[in-house]
Amino acid sequence: MSIRVYLWWNSLLYSSMNILLINDNTEHLNWGAQATVFALRKMFEEHIPAISLDAIPWNWLRREYRQVQLPGKLKFTYQRWRHNVIAEKFLNRISSSAEFFPAIFDDFDYYADQWMACNADPEAADFLRRATAADAVVYNGENSIYRNTVEGCRALFLLWVAKTRLHKPSAIINHTAHLDNVQPRMPAMVRHLFPILDVVTCREPSGWRQIKGMGIDHAELVPDAVFYLRDTIDGNEAFQTWKQAAGLEGKPYFCLSGSALPASEPRSVWDGKVVELVRRLQKFGLHPVLVAKDPDCLFLEEVARRTGGSFFGPEHSFHEMWPLFRGASFLVSGHYHYVIAAASAGCPFIPLSVNNWKMQGVCIHLEWQRTEPFDVTDLGSCMPELVAEARRLLKDREALSKALMARTERLCEESVLNAVRVREMATQGTTVTTYERR
């Protein structure tokens, strides 16, 4: 049965299902984050009959507000304005920060009561309206449950409101939980919120084990949603145009990207270790393609200049990652979703360290021979081993490519559980309607 027939048949059996998705990363400055929400939308549409999807964007979760005290007890609240330095300095002198979200778990109930009483964020009423109209509230946990991120803490609070005040079926899916080695504010939020959620899916093994170790027994290990896209993304036309302009037709190349951690970038007469690494890899007779979307990785454009390489920059769409990596001999990267796209396209990879255990997790998922990433902050020490790893990948590329594509096909099938669990939750209703107020 084709997917279209399947959806038509199920639409006859199910009424419309309204899902409120928190954390739409479409406008995020990261290709992987953009690909995540694209994949989730595609997955939901294909596996949840008659779905109606409402979404709260990532930047909504990061908005800052300030208040000006007016005569009497009146206050004027406005969204922080950053477009003019002089104007912002003046406004900051006559205003104070307006806090509408809790910073720690102990304050969740106080702020939830304020929200329900309409004494909160100017957008609180809008969120409550949209959450009330939804059959279920789902938080896309991409890029947030670590480092006490503002958007992560706020999204957890929104789930708390949806679950404990509005009694909505609620879920967090597709997330990495890395609650160690940070100022510990998130662990308490997770410890109290996750047990009362209807669905919790973790996308990599280490985060899943940590969540399970906190007593959250119903948490499930489900591969990242981007695996669902496989190598089916249509970015070929735009990529081919760039490839011809870059003079890469018929030229063997490798790709290298950065990481969320800082790397040794070129400065003045200092080339830095990234340039040195690229030059070492060029000795295999390959043309370097430096890949960067995130602002912190744009130094790779200078690396491309110094090495005679090509720069694949932020003007490109995430859709073009698949054809880019499909033609590469290998990828060196500390970006989680770049590795997923590369593996799906049959491109072997060399993992670089990041600021959490995502990279180790994707290596385990892919049953990759090397699960310990190379330290991107100490390339000078690990460069000989990294170059040897590149030599191994080149030697065994064909076999490695076939193994990666077979494995990602399996992970694609398993990733659908993100949508299946949301569908079951919204259909069956919430399993927890009360909680012990502290």
Task: Provide a role label for each language-model segment.
Residues W8-R438:
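Active-site anion-handling motifs in enzyme catalytic cores
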